[in-house]
Amino acid sequence: LTQSMAIIEYLDEKYPQINLMPADIENRARVRQLAQITACDIHPLNNLRVLKYLKKELNVEDDDKDNWYQHWIIQGFNALEESIKKSRLTGPYCMGEKLSLVDLCLIPQMYNAHRFKVSMENYPILSEIEKTCLALDAFQQATPEKQIDAI
């Protein structure tokens, strides 16, 4: 498998004791909606392949490339922050008390947003979720610096 969402769903189904999807159909749909804001609206415009294309093929200056990144992450984070605020269940994660697929999609984008110096002042909910997730060992072990192929 090579696509993040397919990998996450595969692992969720293979190891059901972790259960990244809520049991009820409404919250399952909500998880998919929130996860897709990140996976479909933010990530495709800001992945490494796109950023390299902007730089190497279109000769976009670094400042303009950074502005591109910031524009699209801000658009996505605005939508995500507002969506979570409107429907957030009580708890430290995107869907309340339990870690979900949404959190797994959010944290890598938060990492990239910091890397591209996106201000988090307008995203208190996302920032609090990030803080909670990064306190977990699994998220600490998954940071890019800890990966064997880190650049």
Each language-model region and where it sits:
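Active-site-flanking alpha-helical
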Residues: 12, 109-110, 143
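Carbohydrate-binding/catalytic loop surfaces
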Residues: 147-151
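GST-like fold's C-terminal all-alpha helical module
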Residues: 38-135
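Conserved beta-strand positions that form and line the central face of beta-propeller blades
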Residues: 19-20, 92, 138
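Short coil/turn segments at secondary-structure boundaries
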Residues: 47-48, 143-145
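Short, solvent-exposed alpha-helical surface patches in well-structured domains
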Residues: 30-33, 128, 141
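GST-like domain detector, emphasizing the conserved glutathione-binding G-site
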Residues: 1-64
